[in-house]
């Protein structure tokens, strides 16, 4: 299956607790093995359990694509080394970079695939350029539907994108041009507009919160290129 419903200890906000790329998924510590297996089988990449200063909200704090993982600057050295060691054991060559900024909810403020990154306009132009260089992609500063939390308001892979339902047609066109994929509006978890918080997705599949309805799943599958 390209899409599976899941909960993390009854929370439907899967995107808060993980970062999905086409090469690896970083996920919070402490999930049941059967849930890790659903993620592995659906997204078809290795899954690494991680923490950031012992926090479980990995998807809020970190982001990444096939080239690099970006973490907040205060992540412990031991946590960085654990991620690097796990990547090495899987034969995955990726940068793992702590990023110094006063903004540390990087997963909320950065939306990226392997083609481009959209970063919140809260970041300076210099910071945006640095983020683009780390991720190895074109970068733009901006908002989605008036929201700085672009990583929460959207999910984008190398096959498609889904964003906040109040995103304008002009913004959709701009996002499609930037990320080089078709981008649609939609919701998850029974009407939640912050779709980035609700799912973990890559080019192989998507794991979405267990409250997501049938019609929402149809739209998610279409938007992320699985139809």
UniProtKB/Swiss-Prot annotation:
It comes from the Archaea. The gene is eif6. The lineage of its organism: Archaea, Methanobacteriati, Methanobacteriota, Thermococci, Thermococcales. Keywords: Initiation factor, Protein biosynthesis. Transmembrane segments: none annotated. NCBIfam families: eIF-6, PRK04046.1-5. Binds to the 50S ribosomal subunit and prevents its association with the 30S ribosomal subunit to form the 70S initiation complex. Belongs to the eIF-6 family. GO terms for biological process: cytosolic ribosome assembly. This is Translation initiation factor 6. Disulfide bonds: none annotated. It holds the Pfam family eIF-6. HAMAP family: eIF_6. One of its GO terms (molecular function) is ribosome binding.
């Amino acid at each position: 299956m390209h899409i599976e419903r899941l909960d993390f200890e009854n929370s439907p906000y899967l995107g808060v607790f993980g970062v999905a790329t086409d090469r690896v998924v970083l996920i919070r510590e402490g999930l049941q093995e059967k849930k890790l297996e659903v993620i592995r089988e659906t997204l078809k990449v290795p899954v690494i359990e991680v923490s950031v200063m012992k926090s479980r909200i990995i998807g809020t704090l970190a982001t990444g694509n096939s080239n690099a993982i970006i973490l907040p600057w205060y992540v412990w050295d031991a946590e960085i080394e654990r991620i690097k060691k796990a990547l090495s054991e899987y034969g995955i060559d990726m940068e793992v970079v702590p990023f110094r900024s006063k903004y540390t909810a990087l997963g909320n403020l950065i939306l990226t695939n392997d083609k481009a990154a959209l970063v919140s306009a809260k970041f300076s132009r210099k910071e945006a350029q640095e983020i683009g260089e780390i991720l190895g992609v074109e970068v733009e500063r901006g908002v989605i539907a008036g929201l700085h939390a672009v990583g929460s308001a959207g999910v984008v892979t190398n096959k498609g994108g889904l964003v906040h339902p109040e995103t304008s047609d002009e913004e959709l066109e701009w996002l499609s041009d930037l990320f080089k994929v078709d981008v649609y509006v939609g919701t998850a978890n029974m009407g939640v507009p912050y779709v980035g918080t609700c799912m973990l997705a890559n080019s192989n599949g998507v794991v979405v919160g267990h409250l997501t309805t049938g019609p929402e799943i149809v739209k998610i599958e279409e938007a992320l290129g699985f139809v």
